[in-house]
Amino acid sequence: MAVKKYSAGVKEYRQTYWMPEYTPLDSDILACFKITPQPGVDREEAAAAVAAESSTGTWTTVWTDLLTDMDYYKGRAYRIEDVPGDDAAFYAFIAYPIDLFEEGSVVNVFTSLVGNVFGFKAVRGLRLEDVRFPLAYVKTCGGPPHGIQVERDKMNKYGRPLLGCTIKPKLGLSAKNYGRAVYECLRGGLDFTKDDENINSQPFMRWRDRFLFVQDATETAEAQTGERKGHYLNVTAPTPEEMYKRAEFAKEIGAPIIMHDYITGGFTANTGLAKWCQDNGVLLHIHRAMHAVIDRNPNHGIHFRVLTKILRLSGGDHLHTGTVVGKLEGDRASTLGWIDLLRESFIPEDRSRGIFFDQDWGSMPGVFAVASGGIHVWHMPALVNIFGDDSVLQFGGGTLGHPWGNAAGAAANRVALEACVEARNQGRDIEKEGKEILTAAAQHSPELKIAMETWKEIKFEFDTVDKLDTQNR
């Protein structure tokens, strides 16, 4: 065996971390970064620098490198590709040995892949576009507490998307009035109602009071309709201890589902809460508050498809995904891609939808995709077509803004949904024939008729900021 000798000093990253001859192993974690280097920094050096700074490297050689097997543990930049329509940026593909990461810890994965390297001076912009988690790593993660099929069985709801509503105004209601709003929505035909992401335990409505009034409303609506109902009780809290306290109380009063803001609340807290939900038979709804700060800039940050994968590993039964047709950012092809990443067992590479790697989830359960944000009854045909059955279609203002009140808004959405599902099952093109389908259903539903009249001119036709790079070709 050759004796390794230490040579002090600074050398180019490419000498150690650029390996175009490398063939990734099935057990490697693979990452695709979009890199915009500083002027004068060539592609190979920039890619190697990212590989180094996100794995074992530092700015100079160190003698302690001789105490370990650097050839095994280092990240390897193994491929570079052009970014369509962008001469300044390029894609760098980097392979990391699985042993660089703690088992079952999305926190540890992110600390390396999106840690200090994102402040590296050699690059002007850096975006994590996609990650391939090998099955060997997937199996170390807890994943969704229950998954799609178990939730359908718990709630006894099959053959259609689920219907939800975020209670508005999002802040300022008393617990009693909040519970009243929940009751009207659930008795009108919705499956779920929801705390808004920024409802925690404020002076106008403390969490315990809200939980009690909401659970009473839920049970009353169940008794009157004969259907299972639920309300996403947000247990996000200042400390993990307080979060678990709220979750335990929700379980004690019989709530079937709780909620967590997984980015603002933190990945450690989310992973722990998902495990608690699995152990205690409680469903877990996940909100993505703060995601756009991280994922909306097309040249720097983390793409939402990565945040989607991280959530599936960390754990959640629902995740907000955007709507395509509503008020929030969301390119259609990209959205369809990350919806599949949430729900399917195996997703092949598909650049047309922004998916850079095959992803095998093995037996890990899927996650309901939640469409929420600026949607109303006129969007129903498109939503059913885009999201399919394993989704939650969540109408906030599109329920509570009905001229006749919450129950009428809920009834309008339920009639519209069932009309679209029936038409789809008959083989009709529900997006093209949506107006005719809804108009026919409205003949038997005055609530739907009024809703259609109220929102017929409401559209959100702004251009998408974060487009697929393939669209620039």
From Swiss-Prot:
Q: List the disulfide bonds.
A: none
Q: Which PROSITE patterns does the UniProt record give?
A: RUBISCO_LARGE
Catalytic residues, per the record, are K168 (proton acceptor), H287 (proton acceptor)
Q: Which UniProt keywords apply?
A: Bacterial microcompartment, Calvin cycle, Carbon dioxide fixation, Carboxysome, Lyase, Magnesium, Metal-binding, Monooxygenase, Oxidoreductase
Q: Which residues bind substrate?
A: N116, T166, K170, R288, H320, S372
The GO terms describing molecular function are: magnesium ion binding; monooxygenase activity; ribulose-bisphosphate carboxylase activity
Instruction: Write down how the cofactor binds this protein.
Output: Binds 1 Mg(2+) ion per subunit.
Give a Pfam family name.
RuBisCO_large_N
Enzyme class label: lyase
Tell what triggers its expression.
Produced when grown in air or in air supplemented with 5% CO(2) (at protein level). Part of the cbbL-cbbS operon.
For whether the record's keyword set contains Nucleotide-binding, the answer is no
Positions bound to Mg(2+):
K194, D196, E197
**Where does the record place the region Necessary and sufficient to target proteins to carboxysomes, interacts with shell proteins?**
1-136
Site label Transition state stabilizer, positions: K327
* Biotechnology annotation for this entry: Expression of 10 genes for alpha-carboxysome (Cb) proteins (cbbL-cbbS-csoS2-csoS3-csoS4A-csoS4B-csoS1C-csoS1A-csoS1B-csoS1D) in E.coli generates compartments that resemble Cb, contain RuBisCO and have its catalytic activity, showing it is possible to make artificial, functional Cb using these 10 genes. Cargo proteins can be targeted to these organelles. Alpha-carboxysomes are assembled in the complete absence of this enzyme in this bacteria, suggesting carboxysome-based microcompartments can be designed for applications such as custom chemical reactors or delivery vehicles.
Reactions this protein catalyses: 2 (2R)-3-phosphoglycerate + 2 H(+) = D-ribulose 1,5-bisphosphate + CO2 + H2O; D-ribulose 1,5-bisphosphate + O2 = 2-phosphoglycolate + (2R)-3-phosphoglycerate + 2 H(+)
Extract the InterPro entries matched here.
RuBisCO, RuBisCo_large_chain_AS, RuBisCO_lsu_C, RuBisCO_lsu_C_sf, RuBisCO_lsu_fd_N, RuBisCO_lsu_N_sf, RuBisCO_lsuI
Q: Which cofactor does it need?
A: Mg(2+)
Could you tell me which residues carry N6-carboxylysine?
Answer: K194
Protein family: Belongs to the RuBisCO large chain family. Type I subfamily.
Q: HAMAP family, alphabetically?
A: RuBisCO_L_type1
Q: Which PANTHER family match?
A: RIBULOSE BISPHOSPHATE CARBOXYLASE, RIBULOSE BISPHOSPHATE CARBOXYLASE LARGE CHAIN
- Subunit structure of this chain's protein: Heterohexadecamer of 8 large chains and 8 small chains. Forms a CsoS2-CsoS1-RuBisCO complex. The N-terminus (residues 1-136) interacts with shell proteins CsoS1A, CsoS1B and CsoS1C. Holo-RuBisCO interacts with the N-terminal repeats of CsoS2; binding is sensitive to ionic strength. A fusion of a single N-terminal repeat to the C-terminus of the large subunit of RuBisCO (cbbL) shows the repeat can lie between a CbbL dimer, making minor contacts to CbbS; thus each RuBisCO holoenzyme could bind 8 repeats.
Q: What is known of its domains?
A: The N-terminus (minimally 1-122, fragment 1-136 does not bind any better) interacts with the shell proteins CsoS1A, CsoS1B and CsoS1C. A slightly longer fragment of the N-terminus (residues 1-136) is required for targeting to carboxysomes, and will direct foreign proteins to the carboxysome, with reduced efficiency compared to the whole protein.
What is the official name of this protein in its record?
Answer: Ribulose bisphosphate carboxylase large chain
